Amino acid sequence: MAATAAASSLQMATTRPSISAASSKARTYVVGANPRNAYKIACTPHLSNLGCLRNDSALPASKKSFSFSTKAMSESSESKASSGLPIDLRGKRAFIAGIADDNGYGWAVAKSLAAAGAEILVGTWVPALNIFETSLRRGKFDQSRVLPDGSLMEIKKVYPLDAVFDNPEDVPEDVKANKRYAGSSNWTVQEAAECVRQDFGSIDILVHSLANGPEVSKPLLETSRKGYLAAISASSYSFVSLLSHFLPIMNPGGASISLTYIASERIIPGYGGGMSSAKAALESDTRVLAFEAGRKQNIRVNTISAGPLGSRAAKAIGFIDTMIEYSYNNAPIQKTLTADEVGNAAAFLVSPLASAITGATIYVDNGLNSMGVALDSPVFKDLNK
């Protein structure tokens, strides 16, 4: 993402590449004429993961990653945030639906929002709730909770949630009797929204990080109607339901985001069971919801099309490691995509800095979506890369 300095007061830029080394000196370039009003842009590896650099020493020189992100800093003190262009979510409250562990995109989004100052509430799938809360309580996630200032991300409250059910009347008897739901209550979308209202009054940010396709490994021609509709229900309509029920308690000027995938518009063999259709529906719904929520309550709605990540949930696809390798070999930016990069994009999208962005699909995939033909195709075997 390129940053443009529109105001004359932004005069200096500092970039610090992070290439597997522990640290490197920043370079400063004067881009304006008035150094007394200058600001510095200091580099951090990731907003939500300051100082955690990946060791690429085992990779060939041509395949080592090179990335930097920027954080506005005052010239008088590089340890204090500048009033220039910070992502500031202090005083904001976010509800993130779909976190069940610490290695997916939902967790990374939560961490980036927390790093920017937001208060974090989480909705966790009921069968995973006990394990998730126990892991939090026993400190299993403490290492991945570390924020740039050294503190641990605080999850203010974890709510049970099954977003395929809008209200208690929708829950079938076999689910009510299922032992995995025993001991939990108020976990439909309607009930979760009401519990958040009772506990906190309102929220500013709603994040949808939910997807499930029970027949994802099946080709579309072999997918049952039940499996197809289940994928749509869990992966796309759940966003409509969440926004519909949480909108009344969202503060005007807030924002909502979801996570999608390039299979919505390109053929990804193996990503079946109706999941490609579900992602296409999610993106289409994003545009409609942006209009409706925007006009009704000044709420922005966007979706992030993230590249492949080897999370526990993605392992269900079966070929996720192949997709990660494919992305590395063929994307314009040849590096491994991290969850933090998606989290940081989310923090930007829900912040006032993105106040004019709504109804958009934002690609965070090292540019893979822009490619027409894979570079590892035999067509390009003699191409000088």
From Swiss-Prot:
Keyword annotations for this protein, in alphabetical order, are: Chloroplast, Fatty acid biosynthesis, Fatty acid metabolism, Lipid biosynthesis, Lipid metabolism, NAD, Oxidoreductase, Plastid, Transit peptide
Superkingdom classification of source: Eukaryota
Instruction: State the similarity comment.
Output: Belongs to the short-chain dehydrogenases/reductases (SDR) family. FabI subfamily.
Q: Does the keyword Transit peptide apply?
A: yes
| Designated name of the protein | Enoyl-[acyl-carrier-protein] reductase [NADH], chloroplastic
What Gene Ontology biological process does one annotation of this record name? fatty acid biosynthetic process
> What Gene3D superfamilies does the entry give?
Enoyl acyl carrier protein reductase, NAD(P)-binding Rossmann-like Domain
Q: Identify the taxonomic lineage of the organism of origin.
A: Eukaryota, Viridiplantae, Streptophyta, Embryophyta, Tracheophyta
Any idea which residues are catalytic in this one? Y261, Y271
Give me the Gene Ontology terms describing cellular component: chloroplast
Compartment list: Plastid, Chloroplast
Task: Tell me its EC number(s), please.
Answer: 1.3.1.9
Q: Where is the transit peptide?
A: 1-73
Q: Name one GO molecular function term.
A: enoyl-[acyl-carrier-protein] reductase (NADH) activity
Name its species: Brassica napus
Task: Please indicate if the UniProt record lists Transit peptide as a keyword.
Answer: yes
Tissue-specific expression: Seeds and leaves.
- Provide the activity regulation entry from the record: Inactivated by phenylglyoxal by binding covalently to two arginine residues.
Catalytic activity, as annotated: a 2,3-saturated acyl-[ACP] + NAD(+) = a (2E)-enoyl-[ACP] + NADH + H(+)
Q: In which pathway does it act?
A: Lipid metabolism; fatty acid biosynthesis
Q: What does this protein do?
A: Catalyzes the NAD-dependent reduction of a carbon-carbon double bond in an enoyl moiety that is covalently linked to an acyl carrier protein (ACP). Catalyzes the last reduction step in the de novo synthesis cycle of fatty acids. Involved in the elongation cycle of fatty acids which are used in lipid metabolism. Required for normal plant growth.
Question: Which InterPro entries has this protein been placed in?
Answer: Enoyl-ACP_Rdtase_NADH, NAD(P)-bd_dom_sf, SDR_fam
Q: Where does NAD(+) bind?
A: G98, Y105, D162, A163, S209, L210, L259, K279, L309, G310, S311, R312, A313
User: What is known about its subunit structure?
Assistant: Homotetramer.
